[in-house]
From Swiss-Prot:
GO terms for cellular component: plasma membrane. The lineage of its organism: Eukaryota, Viridiplantae, Streptophyta, Embryophyta, Tracheophyta. Residues 1-7, 70-79, 151-180 are cytoplasmic. It is a multi-pass membrane protein. Signal peptide: none annotated. This is CASP-like protein 2D1. Residues 170-180 have a biased composition (Basic and acidic residues). It comes from Sorghum bicolor (Sorghum). Homodimer and heterodimers. Disulfide bonds: none annotated. Keywords: Cell membrane, Membrane, Transmembrane, Transmembrane helix.
């Protein structure tokens, strides 16, 4: 499949990222719960959840910009920039997902070795919203992983690069091996 044949799936992935990232952001940013006995918990109390909100905002904004750039006349000189930005977005989504998942795991199970009790039995709605946000975040991550692969394919196909050495390099290696 030629790189130009990936235009529609690429655009569909970019369009999908925006609502996924914004829904994840909204679900987490509005996440707070109060309990008469244990007080209040909100997303901003936990740095991993705040990081997830920030990364969702950045990736949604980048996805919007990349949709606009992609809808304009495709300029090959921006292919590398798009590739790097898609990769960076995927990496940011991975790191924020892992930070949020760790917090959610601690909230659900606690950690007896450091005397942290589980809190989801007291703040169930908070944990539920955090889980939904993390699932939406993971879906946005899957889109960006696919976008990074599409972008890499586009860059490699437009620059004529490949994963294999040129035939003359293979011939030279073969000759050197034969005469050494």
């Amino acid at each position: 499949m030629a790189a130009s044949g990936l235009k529609v799936p690429e655009m569909a992935l970019r369009v999908c990222v925006v609502p996924l990232a914004l829904a994840s952001l909204w679900e987490m940013a509005t996440n707070a719960q109060a309990d008469d006995t244990y007080g209040e918990v909100k997303f901003s109390d936990l740095s991993g959840f705040s990081y997830l909100v920030g990364v969702n905002a950045v990736t949604a904004a980048y996805a919007l910009v990349s949709i606009l750039l992609s809808s304009l006349k495709p300029l090959a000189r921006y292919d590398w920039v798009i590739l790097v930005m898609d990769q960076a977005s995927a990496y940011l989504l991975v790191t924020s997902a892992s930070a949020a998942a760790e917090l959610l795991q601690l909230a659900r199970r606690g950690d007896r070795e450091v005397s942290w009790g589980e809190v989801c039995s007291y703040f169930g709605r908070f944990c539920g919203k955090a889980t939904v946000s993390l699932a939406l975040h993971a879906a946005a991550l899957a889109c960006f992983v696919a976008l990074a692969l599409v972008s890499a394919f586009r860059v490699l196909s437009t620059t004529g690069s490949s994963c294999h050495p040129p035939k003359h390099a293979q011939a030279q290696e073969h000759e050197q091996g034969r005469y050494n």
